[in-house]
């Protein structure tokens, strides 16, 4: 194959990336390792905290990022999926990548692909995104990078890094077609990110998954820090109290809503404290407290409208939906009208999710809808009419805003891609 010289590409970087979305994600690391070698292994230029989990990855990374920023450390974060634009996936100190940096870094990866495809197939979309993140963080000279796993861990594209620490936020049933049909099988995939002799922070894992993590951790001689064992969190009237073997910290307020976010906060804080201790870095207690009070994470219990209140939450699997329902039950006062607008992808357990919402929130009005994404559920998936279905979410929201009282709440939940679609309506 004849290589194209620099500047001869017929596509822009964005067009090239869009074209690569048609290629299925490859589960294997050889091609990615070759690519990073061509890019001079930028992932070796900074310490990395590698984060996996069924749910809670993004929120945990958001809190970790805030903790590092408030300590004055330059932190990069790679997250997925993006809610508005590709650049949302790449963050430095919480700020999204500029269009200029996107073009420059994307072009570097595209040039490397020209050499790569002499022996390998073209890169997949997620391989490009991961490579761009690792190059970007090196160019910006971050002091620490937070890397979110795409799916699983063991064979995930991100698992070519030699991380300083690993984190598992949670383990539940999701992506069974790729990860396995039991919690043990899924745990094997997620513990695949563990590295020899590293510190590992484990969230609130089910017993079956925790047992796998302990076996793998022992095999790799990892220093395991487990929720409710090495560290814990307690909700009090004026915030919450975090405790581990070294310290006890009172946090007046957590800006992220939902009881489950307390567990994510505990994981983030334990990870942060271990990292700073390992590198013998000083810690400002007031900065820790402030970081939790200002942290935000788009699309996760995000209030996008007041009077009436409209809240977005990407509860994209049954495990996350249970946490969502728990929060809804705690919200508001008796008699307040709650409306749930839900959509998901057909490949998910959407019928089980709808049934769960109907069972657990019988007083709420449940509305199912579709959205512009290949594989989204449609009205034909509910032919009997037993579920209220609207074809277009945008007019529904517009009507809701004009007719609902200030005491009513609209919860919009389901697929993260649905949340992205809805968020564009509010963030114009």
Q: For each predicted feature, which ranges?
A:
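Hydrophobic positions on the alpha1 helix immediately C-terminal to the Walker A/P-loop
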Residues: 59-63
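C-terminal helical cap/extension that packs against the catalytic core
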Residues: 206-221, 309-310, 352-410
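Acidic, Mg2+-coordinating active-site environments of NTP-dependent enzymes
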Residues: 116-117, 140-148, 163-251, 265, ...
């Amino acid at each position: 194959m004849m290589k194209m010289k620099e500047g001869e590409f017929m596509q822009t970087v964005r067009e090239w990336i869009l074209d690569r979305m048609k290629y299925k994600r490859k589960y294997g690391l050889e091609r990615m390792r070759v690519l990073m070698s061509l890019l001079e292994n930028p992932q070796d230029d900074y310490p990395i905290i590698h984060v996996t989990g069924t749910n809670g990855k993004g929120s945990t990374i958001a809190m970790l990022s805030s903790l590092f920023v408030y300590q004055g450390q330059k932190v990069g974060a790679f997250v997925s999926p993006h809610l508005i634009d590709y650049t949302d996936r790449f963050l430095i100190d919480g700020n999204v990548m500029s269009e200029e940096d996107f073009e420059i870094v994307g072009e570097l990866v595209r040039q490397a692909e020209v050499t790569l495809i002499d022996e390998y197939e073209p890169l997949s979309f997620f391989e490009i995104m991961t490579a761009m993140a690792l190059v970007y963080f090196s160019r910006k000279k971050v002091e620490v990078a937070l890397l979110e796993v795409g799916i699983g861990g063991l064979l995930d594209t991100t698992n070519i890094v030699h991380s300083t620490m690993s984190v598992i936020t949670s383990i539940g049933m999701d992506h069974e077609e790729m990860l396995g049909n039991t919690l043990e099988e899924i745990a094997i995939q997620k513990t695949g990110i563990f590295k020899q002799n590293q510190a590992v922070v484990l969230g609130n894992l089910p017993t079956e998954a925790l047992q796998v993590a302990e076996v793998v951790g022992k095999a790799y001689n990892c220093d395991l820090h487990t929720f409710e064992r090495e560290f814990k969190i307690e909700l009090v009237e004026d915030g919450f109290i975090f405790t581990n073997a070294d310290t006890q910290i009172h946090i007046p307020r957590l800006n992220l809503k939902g009881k489950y976010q307390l567990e994510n906060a505990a994981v983030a804080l334990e990870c942060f404290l271990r990292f700073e201790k390992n590198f013998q870095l000083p810690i400002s207690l007031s900065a820790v407290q402030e970081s939790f009070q200002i942290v935000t994470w788009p699309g996760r219990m995000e209030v996008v409208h007041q009077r009436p209140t409209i809240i977005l939450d990407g509860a994209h699997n049954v495990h996350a939906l249970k946490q969502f329902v728990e929060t809804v039950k705690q919200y508001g006062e008796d008699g307040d009208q709650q409306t749930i607008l839900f959509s998901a992808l057909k490949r998910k357990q959407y019928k089980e999710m709808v049934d769960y919402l109907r069972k657990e929130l019988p007083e709420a009005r449940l509305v199912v809808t579709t959205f512009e994404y290949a594989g989204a559920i449609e009205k034909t998936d509910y032919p009997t009419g037993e579920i209220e279905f609207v074809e277009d979410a945008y007019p529904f929201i517009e009507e809701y805003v004009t007719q609902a009282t200030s005491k009513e709440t609209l919860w919009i939940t389901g697929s993260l891609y649905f949340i992205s679609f809805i968020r564009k309506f509010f963030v114009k």
